[in-house]
Amino acid sequence: MCYGKIISMKKVMMFIICLFLCGCSSASSSRKVYNEYVDTLKGVKEEKMCSGIEVTFKVDEITEDYINYYALINRNGNVMKNIQALLIHDKETINSFPSIGIYDEDVSLINEEDKIGVKLSGYLEVNENTIFKLLLKYVDKDNVKKECYYIYNYQHN
């Protein structure tokens, strides 16, 4: 009877170890994708817009020293499945860049009842000029993969 409990305990321990290792692998994979997207965006020199998708950049000064920046992705009724997006800027920071669908589950906007879009938002110290770049990937209603790049040059007054 004691022998059976030991085997059960070993199975439980092996299961916990497997879950832990799978979780670490997933985080490592997400980090790799995130870094690849950052590198891709750093190399982008011009926009490649997705037809029917509207992207709006906004910057609000929240204090004398900090701004809140965000990109609003409006799907305009289009089907957007498995959305992945990353918003970067050209300033040095210790913070990670806002993203969706990379570290968390992909978002899909399919039905009319779904939200009209996605918002990526972050905070940054005030600078005279900041260049923001957005990478947007998704699958459309015909299951065609789309990849788009948007650029916004912010001028502080």
State where each predicted segment sits.
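Bacterial signal peptide processing site
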Residues: 25-27
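Positively charged n-region of N-terminal signal peptides that target proteins for export
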Residues: 1-12
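Short, low-complexity, Pro/Ser/Thr/Gly-rich segments in the mature regions of secreted, periplasmic
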Residues: 146-157
